[in-house]
Amino acid sequence: MSHRPRSDRHSFSSPSRFWHRLGMGLLVAGTLALPVSTLAQEGGEGAQPKASPSPIQSPNSSNGEATPRSFFNSGSPRSAEPKMNYGQLIDAIKANQVAKVEVDTNRRQAIVTLKDAPPGSKPQTVQLLDNNPELLNLLRSRSETIDLDINRTPDNSALYGLLTNLLVVAILIGLVVMVVRRSANASGQAMSFGKSKARFQMEAKTGVGFDDVAGIDEAKEELQEVVTFLKQPEKFTAIGAKIPRGVLLIGPPGTGKTLLAKAIAGEAGVPFFSISGSEFVEMFVGVGASRVRDLFKKAKENAPCLVFIDEIDAVGRQRGVGYGGGNDEREQTLNQLLTEMDGFEGNSGIIVIAATNRPDVLDLALLRPGRFDRQVTVDYPDVQGRELILAIHAQNKKLHEEVQLAAIARRTPGFTGADLANVLNEAAIFTARRRKEAITMAEVNDAIDRVVAGMEGTPLVDSKSKRLIAYHEVGHALIGTLCPGHDPVEKVTLIPRGQAQGLTWFTPDEDQSLMTRNQMIARIAGLLGGRVAEEVIFGDDEVTTGAGNDIEKITYLARQMVTKLGMSSLGLVALEEEGDRNFSGGDWGKRSEYSEDIAARIDREIQAIVTAAHQRATRIIEENRNLMDLLVDALIDQETIEGEHFRQLVESYQQSQKQPALAGK
């Protein structure tokens, strides 16, 4: 039988050394498992105990019952499954049935190999006792017949204890290091509050150039000149021209101010810094001014360069005023910005570009030449500009051949570039939802309605309410068609959108920046058309709340005519001075400098204008009562009537009556 390597080997040829080690090293251990056959069977009277197995019988073979295994066998000199108790070992030695004993002095175990063990059987495991006088005597007497092998497995308890202590120390050190690093980061963050948060690009790759900007040619030309200043400064300095210090982009939201800044960054080829005005000010005092200094310090190191400040009104608001009291931190930030842009040291080579839609709240010192030398207005695009913008946004979209960008541009007056991009995107979404291969005019029209009026609702069923809404909307459309000076009808629909149960669109033939008095009176009459139709058809007691928004617009237009535009008997005087509008859209800054008598006259003038328009609308509705019933029936049947079809219905009815229906001449 082969054996694994041993640390030392002993035989009974050296008995003195063996007895010493065995007597000093054995430890008390109880029997781990006892064979069932060795236990006296309990029973009633007359029960007989079972015979004990022979010393060489395997305990787990008794009556076919298995003996529980020991969990202490791993790491023993030899793997052994069967168990033998101490008494069975003594009996086996006395019977001269033991061939070999392997002793593990650390584990206090003995692996016993029997002489007559069946082939393939495993050695027996025996737990040794603390005092073994009987075993010592037996081994002395049979030292020549029993092969003894003593092994000492390594005692790793000290090593494990050392490793455990080292692990605890390592964990403590790690915790200390983590706490120190966190505190260092916290202090570093506190110190970095004063650093600028501007995004820096050595060569800005915005993906936008001047070719991607359309509809605002005047503003684009101004900024292209700034790029030329940066690329070819000698062209201007040769004749004594100076590079402008700053360019302020002014315009309504969505008109392309930020897009222009991206185009400048993409075309200039110089270092580009971009930051929002709200990123300067923090909760700590002095942080805003420190960030301004840090921003311009970096800009001077990379001059010539561009610095873009978006929404500059967040930090450049006029000092010393405000509805909520002063803000010293914001004013300190503004003072530092003024100094950096045009102070004692100057900032040669740095061009500051800023954007805002609130130029009325900016500090006057910020707007003076030397800081923002140029103020570029980015206004709503005209019809040609809208067509060019649509062409840019339609490049990556699949349009049906029936789609005409010029027609879309004519139908979208007052739309910004962002609105037009949203219209085409909504049209593409409608096309995908309807599983069409290309965008048609139906999707474009639905997209315009979606952007202007909101999401489409569920159409009303035929009822009294639907007929009443139809008369209301036809009243608007009929007044707009028959009243000279009014914008033409674009569409009349009973399909709800947003909060409106029905809608009537009017689209001017051309972009209008000026309006005549006749046009304003016609617009007031058109707004009254819905209420007048309810009064004529259903009576004064059946009018609804549907005209609430119309009446608000009527009152605003009439008041503007009286107090601001000089279109009343009060003469050419401005009775109300517009103040700065706040962010919530209110008119807290409006001042009214007139007496109570003038206020009463203003109210009478407003009432006179509205009354005249109401009488005009009533006359048109009453003179075309049958035409109105015809149009209402058509609208209920079709739910939507386009403007051209509506005008054809009116013209065909007029021809059938052989008399003109025009009024107000």
Swiss-Prot record:
Asked if the record carries the keyword Metal-binding, the reply is yes
Q: Where is this region: Disordered?
A: 41-79
The protein's organism comes out as Synechocystis sp. (strain ATCC 27184 / PCC 6803 / Kazusa)
Give a Pfam family name: Peptidase_M41
Active site positions: E473
Q: Which ranges make up the Cytoplasmic topological domains here?
A: 1-21, 181-665
Q: What is this protein called?
A: ATP-dependent zinc metalloprotease FtsH 1
The family note in this entry says: In the central section; belongs to the AAA ATPase family. In the C-terminal section; belongs to the peptidase M41 family.
Note the topology in the membrane. Multi-pass membrane protein
Q: Which residues lie on this side of the membrane: Lumenal?
A: 43-159
Could you give the cofactor binding note from the entry?
Binds 1 zinc ion per subunit.
What does the record say about induction? Slight induction by UV-B light.
Binding locations of ATP: G251, P252, P253, G254, T255, G256, K257, T258
Q: What is its EC number?
A: 3.4.24.-
- Gene that specifies this protein: ftsH1
Gene Ontology terms: cellular component: plasma membrane-derived thylakoid membrane
User: Per its UniProt record, what SUPFAM superfamilies does this chain match?
Assistant: FtsH protease domain-like, P-loop containing nucleoside triphosphate hydrolases
